Amino acid sequence: YAKEKGMEICRQKYGKFVCDILDYIVKGGHPNLFLHDNGLLYSNGKERVISWMNAVVDGRPVNPRSGYLVEFNGLWYNGLRFAAALFAEDSEMASKVEQWNEIADKTAESFVHTFLNDYGYLVDYVDGAMSDWSVRPNMLIALSLDYSPLDKRQRKRALEVVTRELLTPKGIRTLSPKSYGYNPTYVGSQTEREYAYHQGPARPWLMGAYADAYLK
């Protein structure tokens, strides 16, 4: 909306809403988004689904993604920088803008340290000492946004991994064939399909994020 109508109109229409969302998270209002001192958002997903990878069997998540989720924190960083840009010309919001930029600086440094591995792609989530190195499309969110904690070289290298391991003519795989648990066949009983749902079958909608990342 800001790109189409301009920042001024966007600020007039949605500025308070954007500010309220960030304040809600920063002040600890959300029951499952915890802002840590390192600038990253932590969420508990061990017992319930918290992301779009929401397959459930017997009331428990098939993919219990928990801790620092890569797409949550990519979106968090983007939101902070966008809000700071949205209110950059508003002198009454100078202290808020400074606060958001300070948090975003921490987020960016921690994001790279936490998610970017030696192979050039982003791990899917990190919870304490456990890092999920599965190659999944959630990293595309962080690669596709206007404000990214990664520099252009880092984004390009990560996208090359996505292209090599996840891109298909029909969409983006939900898991790389090289990653543990890969199962591209969505057939069988409801339970069998739930177990396979995010373990390899391609999703056409993820091509949007891929295209945005590619163009950047």
Predicted features by range, described:
Residues 10, 88-99, 168, 189:
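Serine/threonine-rich low-complexity intrinsically disordered regions
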Residues 2-17, 29-36:
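Short secondary-structure capping/junction motifs at helix and strand boundaries
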Residues 1-9, 74-94, 141-152, 208-216:
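Well-ordered alpha-helical scaffold segments within catalytic/enzyme domains
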Residues 11, 15, 66-73, 97, ...:
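Amphipathic, non-membrane alpha-helical segments in soluble helical-bundle scaffolds
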Residues 27-68, 106-205:
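Extended glycan-interaction surfaces of carbohydrate-active proteins
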Residues 11-26, 77, 81, 97-112, ...:
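Hydrophobic core segments within long, regular secondary-structure runs in both alpha-
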Residues 13, 17-21, 36-37, 149, ...:
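Short, charge-rich amphipathic segments
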